[in-house]
């Protein structure tokens, strides 16, 4: 089934707690994850909370990647939303699982903007002229 985008919602458990609390490492890892998908990086914003935790977003031309970490629990919540046929959010998922040293994951994928539900013909390109 064709869709405008793919949205991976991932729960990373039993991660490296030091990595989860390192805002520079998390930001660089999220940018690298965007590059792994084949996406075009637009901007990013990350914040380290006190006493611990990091939240951040990487905006890509094809949508966004976000992360929220709870180092005290070894846990990270990650959204990987990409649009178009040229990017693969699963590459970002695989990369982040390795970088965060996650021992256990729960992940689901949602198709966003399903062609048949919007009324777009199945053979239509993603980018139509307006």
UniProtKB/Swiss-Prot annotation:
InterPro entries hit by this protein: AdoMetDC_C, AdoMetDC_fam_prok, AdoMetDC_N, S-AdoMet_deCO2ase_core, S-AdoMet_deCOase_pro-enz
Active-site residues (renumbered): 63, 68, 83
Superkingdom in the source lineage: Bacteria
GO MF assignments: adenosylmethionine decarboxylase activity
CC terms in the record's Gene Ontology section: cytosol
Gene3D superfamilies linked: 3.30.160.750, S-adenosylmethionine decarboxylase domain (3.30.360.110)
One Pfam family in the UniProt entry: AdoMet_dc
Any one GO BP annotation for this protein: spermidine biosynthetic process
Signal peptide: none
Annotated site residues (Cleavage (non-hydrolytic)) in this chain: 62-63
Modified residues (Pyruvic acid (Ser)): 63
Pathway membership: Amine and polyamine biosynthesis; S-adenosylmethioninamine biosynthesis; S-adenosylmethioninamine from S-adenosyl-L-methionine: step 1/1
Enzyme Commission designation: 4.1.1.50
Task performed by this protein: Catalyzes the decarboxylation of S-adenosylmethionine to S-adenosylmethioninamine (dcAdoMet), the propylamine donor required for the synthesis of the polyamines spermine and spermidine from the diamine putrescine.
Name of the molecule in the record: S-adenosylmethionine decarboxylase proenzyme
Lineage: Bacteria, Thermotogati, Thermotogota, Thermotogae, Thermotogales
Annotated gene: speH
